[in-house]
Amino acid sequence: MTDIVYDKDADLSLIQGRKVAVIGYGSQGHAHALNLRDSGVEVVIGLKEGSTSRAKAEEQGFTVKTPSDASAWADVIVILAPDQHQRGLYADSVRDNLTEGKTLVFAHGFNIRFGYIEAPEGVDVVLVAPKGPGHTVRREFEAGRGVPVIVAVEVDASGKAWDLAWSYAKGIGGLRAGGIRTTFTEETETDLFGEQAVLCGGTSQLVQYGFETLIEAGYQPQIAYFEVLHELKLIVDLMWEGGIAKQRWSISDTAEYGDYVSGPRVISPDVKENMKAVLADIQSGAFADRFIKDQDAGAPEFLELRKKGEEHPIESTGRELRKLFAWNKADDDYTDGSVAR
């Protein structure tokens, strides 16, 4: 049984005694920074000149420096920029400001696992990864709760990296819910696999195919949308609360029987073999190489695939239906139907 680490197991004073620079002020960046500050930690934000996030960080009371100046000032540098930008950011603004005794913190192990970032000797390298989006991390913290967190140490130059990592995890509220020890390799490979095979890629493709099947059979697109996309949240919420068993306990006998006899017809053993191939590409570094090369070239494949997804008819159907939803919640900075950030 995996040991779970809680607030009582970590010493908050360790991170309170450090100067922390959070590089990036997006979803995770704002949550880490605000939660750490509320936990009594001295925090500055590192952002490039002209960053659209600068005004927001300043409005929320933070001192904003360039990434280079923030890294030079800090004892703990938290790199929360997008994966594809971390390598350049590190080389241009962070690496030369790392001295013995400092700590690098990541919320995802991509750049360490695949060798895009290598820390100099004498620098601790740790991972503190909340298992939820930044807005949830912040909201749960403010409510006196937390989002579970996984923690890893890649380099323990000081001999105290684990203690500081758990202290940081406590500072952002993760140990209120519980923390699990992992490795950079395990976190990176399982996170990418979950996103690609199940949570994002697998689910998106399954929903689109279900929608297409009903439309091609002559059913109304609005009805198809409700059946294969809208109701998905209701089922996933039940699974989140109590696993697949609670989901099956909550549905009708007809739905449960259909689950057993038709699920394996749709998600056949061949799908599992395809999943293994996806995992192999992740483990070998092939996916990372393809992603970074495309990003370095201006992201032509990425942008083409994004555009194709936005043009799928399920999106236009959904936009019209969501206007009718009294319970619909929209983020202030989101344009309905657009993936661009």
Swiss-Prot record:
Involved in the biosynthesis of branched-chain amino acids (BCAA). Catalyzes an alkyl-migration followed by a ketol-acid reduction of (S)-2-acetolactate (S2AL) to yield (R)-2,3-dihydroxy-isovalerate. In the isomerase reaction, S2AL is rearranged via a Mg-dependent methyl migration to produce 3-hydroxy-3-methyl-2-ketobutyrate (HMKB). In the reductase reaction, this 2-ketoacid undergoes a metal-dependent reduction by NADPH to yield (R)-2,3-dihydroxy-isovalerate. The active site is at 108. It comes from the Bacteria. The lineage of its organism: Bacteria, Bacillati, Actinomycetota, Actinomycetes, Micrococcales. Belongs to the ketol-acid reductoisomerase family. Its cofactor is Mg(2+). Mg(2+) 2 binds at residues 191, 227, 231. Binds 2 magnesium ions per subunit. Residues 183-328 form the KARI C-terminal knotted domain. NADP(+) binds at residues 25-28, 48, 51, 53, 83-86, 134. It comes from Clavibacter sepedonicus. Residues 2-182 form the KARI N-terminal Rossmann domain. Pfam families: KARI_C (PF01450), KARI_N (PF07991). GO terms for molecular function: ketol-acid reductoisomerase activity; magnesium ion binding; NADP binding. It catalyses: (2R)-2,3-dihydroxy-3-methylbutanoate + NADP(+) = (2S)-2-acetolactate + NADPH + H(+); (2R,3R)-2,3-dihydroxy-3-methylpentanoate + NADP(+) = (S)-2-ethyl-2-hydroxy-3-oxobutanoate + NADPH + H(+). GO terms for cellular component: cytosol. This is Ketol-acid reductoisomerase (NADP(+)). Its EC number is 1.1.1.86. GO terms for biological process: isoleucine biosynthetic process; L-valine biosynthetic process. The keyword Ligase does not apply. NCBIfam families: ilvC, PRK05479.1, PRK13403.1. Mg(2+) 1 binds at residues 191, 195. Pathway: Amino-acid biosynthesis; L-isoleucine biosynthesis; L-isoleucine from 2-oxobutanoate: step 2/4; Amino-acid biosynthesis; L-valine biosynthesis; L-valine from pyruvate: step 2/4. The gene is ilvC. The keyword Oxidoreductase applies. Gene3D superfamilies: 6.10.240.10, NAD(P)-binding Rossmann-like Domain. Substrate binds at residue 252.
